[in-house]
Curated annotation (Swiss-Prot):
Keyword terms of this UniProt record: Lyase, Magnesium, Manganese, Metal-binding, Riboflavin biosynthesis
Record HAMAP family: RibB
Gene Ontology cellular component terms for the protein in this record: cytosol
The protein, known as: 3,4-dihydroxy-2-butanone 4-phosphate synthase
Amino acid sequence: MNQSLLAPFGTAIERVEAGLEALRQGQGVLVVDDEDRENEGDLIFAAESLTNAQMAMLIRECSGIVCLCLPDEKVKALELPPMVENNSSQYGTAFTVSIEAKVGVTTGVSAADRVTTIKAAIADNAKPSDLARPGHVYPLRAQPGGVLTRRGHTEGTIDLMQLAGLKPAGVLCEVTNPDGTMARLPEIIAFGAAHNMPVLTIEDIVVYRKSLLANVG
């Protein structure tokens, strides 16, 4: 990761803190993973404060595969099985079956319908019977231990929500360029500047979490 491009956003700790504050304010953040991994940037919002306008941005500016990151215990509570029995994807992305709210949606495709589905899934009293399967929202199961266990956007999203003091559920989608190619760090930084969103990396979250552990120790 070319850290020099990120220097205007401060140190790793400062970048994470800016991201946490944005999430607390109901705004989006951009998270880039390692160059030797997916080398992609995801636009991430807190699920609990997600708006229809933010969902529309995810659909319009990103890949369109809008995912709901959930901790393992929530996936189990909703009885969401893995999308496939044997996950052979390159990075082991833990998709579950896709979902739709049973109440309050039409076809499930619109921004408003997808927000309704997400709010139904993350409700404190949500039950498996509240969700239809399949649907147009794609849950991702985060590994316990977060980015210290797996350096993925799914784990980074849950870590950020927990560090921000929010409900551990976040919505993400990969940022794409207008021509449909994947946005890399320079394009992600430009996107962040255009939309006044902080940019940080998975490595930043690792550094931040390790610093917290060191302070506790």
